[in-house]
Structure formats: C-alpha cells, structure tokens
Amino acid sequence: MALNLRKNHQILKVINNALIDLPTPPNISTWWNFGSLLGICLISQIVTGLLLAMHYTADTNLAFSSVAHMCRDVQFGWLIRNLHANGASFFFICIYLHIGRGLYYGSYLNKETWNIGVILLLTLMATAFVGYVLPWGQMSFWGATVITNLFSAIPYIGQTLVEWAWGGFSVDNPTLTRFFALHFLLPFLIVGLTLVHLTFLHETGSNNPLGIPSDCDKIPFHPYYTVKDILGFVLMLSLLVSLALFSPNLLGDPENFTPANPLVTPPHIKPEWYFLFAYAILRSIPNKLGGVLALAASILVLFLTPLLHTSKFRSMTFRPLSQILFWALVANVLVLTWVGSQPVEHPFIIIGQLASLSYFTIILVLFPLAAILENKLLKL
C-alpha cells in the first residue's frame, strides 16, 4: 500500500496536522474566522510592504519624494501603497474583533495562547507606529516626536533613552533609517510569534461558543473550515480592495500630504484611528508619567484577564450581566476612540476622563464582581 505523503512527509504532516486534519469543534461561529483573516492580513502586508521597500528611500530629504514617486511613476505603485496603508487598518479591525471574541467567550483561559496573543498585539502596534513615520509627512514627524518623547517620562534614564532612540537630539535622519529597519524586521517577528501562538492553540484545541469541552465531538478542519475561511478571505479582501480603490485616504490624516517640517507644528497632533482609544487614555491624565503608565496599562491589562476570571462558566453565552458589561466596554472603547480624535478642550476632556476611568473599572472591578454575582444567582 502506498504511503499517504500528506501524513508521512516530515514537513507536510506538520501542515496537515495544523490545517487539514486538525480536529475542530463543530459549532464555532464566524467570530472564529478572524484568526485566519489576521494571517491573510499579515501575508498581504508583507508582500505589499516588500514591493514598497524596493522603491522607498529612508532619508529625510528623499523619503517623502520617494513615496510620491512610487504613486506616480511605479507600475501600480499607487495601488500597492493604498493596499498597504489600508491593510494596516484592516489588520487592526481584525485583531480588535479577535480580542473581543476572546474576552466574550473566555478564550483567555488558554493562558499561553492568550499571553502570546497580547505580545503579538504589542508587536503589531510597534510595527504600525514605526511604519507611519516612514512617509515623512507632517503627522509622521510630529507623531514620532510626541510618542517617542513619552519615554522621557521614565525616571532617571528617560531623557537618555529618548536621545538613544532618536540617534540625536531630535527626530531626524538616524531616527528615520532605524525606524525603516525596524519596520522591515518586526513583521517577521510577528510571523514567528504567530507560529508560537498556533502551536499553543493546537495543544489545547479551539474553544467554542458554549465554552464547554468538545473533545468527544470534533470535525476535521478541511473541508468544513477551509471553505468557511475562504469565504471570510473573499469578504475581507473585497472590502480592502474597495476601500483602497474608492476611498484610499478616508482613514488617513490630510496633514500627512505636507512634507515634514520641524518648524511648523500641526494644530492637532493625533495618531491613526486604531491608536486613538489609547491616546485618549494617555491625554486624560494631566501628569506625564501618570499618562504614560495609563497608556501602557490600557493594553497590558489584557494580561490580567485570566487572573480576574471568577465565573464558573467559561463563556459569556449564559451570563446576561457580564454581556451587558461587555457591550458597555465596547461602547466605552468607541467613545474613547472618538474623544482621542477631538481637540483638548472643555467637553472632551471630562468625557475622556470618565471613559478612561470606566474602561479600567469595567475590566478590573465590574467583570469579576458580575461573575461572582451570577454564580450566586445561578446557585453554582
């Protein structure tokens, strides 16, 4: 009898066990599609990024012009650039939905998978930040100046650290060249972390909407979920291509069409939309170090979610109080995103402070208390 190559070849059997014969719960919903969508985002970003890097020049005098040249003179350069810029937005949409799914259905109880996932989020944020600096427009320059300056809030070593990161006494040519090097390198770190993330996931198997073990009732990943994933790919790529072709600058800042000028500060410095919620938390604290700590805590708080799980249920499917809190948290993050895009003046300051307070209160206090109350009400 001929050996089945797919199951016996050293490399093919790894792929087979991860993508073809993988035992999968039969009831996972479309919320479980976002992991594979993130994989597609990563591949498309690396491919478009590589093509852009072939034409980009990491020099303060030439960076802006090289991007303009790409859009004017390179075959489909405008399309590659628009796909790359908007692909970043889709990457963040998918990762936020993926994290939201994890919080709702208790996927964070796979602790290793969850912790690697949070590290992936931090790496993605770093990659997007250094990438935004590369076109060397006004918002690129001032965004880099403001965000790197936050490190100066670290006691004793802060100022030295910032000047070390800048490679001088301000954001200049050395900063741009090292940011380009980092922007090229970090996606490959993300690929490596993704493989670790998947390895830990396949140790325990996927969670499911009911939050109960499904070991007794699994189906193969292929053809059921391969087809389902391909549908997700088609829908997401259709949306990405539509945005890149019809409204490529919708999510960008018009300020970035002006070349960087250290002598002119834009009236309102703000990051890309996917960082606005964290930016609003940073701004809501009138102390520099306090703001930086709150900014870090807004993401690092995700590491604590497995420790704060007090419910006897894994998923929120049968927990109405926790569901209300979860959707309040979603609304809260949307409010923070909106406030982050507004100028620092009367109504927005207090709204931002209240939203920041409620963000941490919901995650750190109300979620565990609601779960304890539900345990009592359901006599668990």
UniProtKB/Swiss-Prot annotation:
Positions contributing to heme b b562 binding: 84, 183
Binding of a ubiquinone, residues: 202
PROSITE patterns, alphabetized: CYTB_CTER, CYTB_NTER
Swiss-Prot/TrEMBL cofactor(s): heme b
Membrane spanning stretches: 34-54, 78-99, 114-134, 179-199, 227-247, 289-309, 321-341, 348-368
Any one GO CC term of the record: respiratory chain complex III
Major subcellular location class: mitochondrion
Binding residues annotated for heme b b566, in chain numbering: 98, 197
Record-given protein name: Cytochrome b
Organism field: Passer montanus (Eurasian tree sparrow)
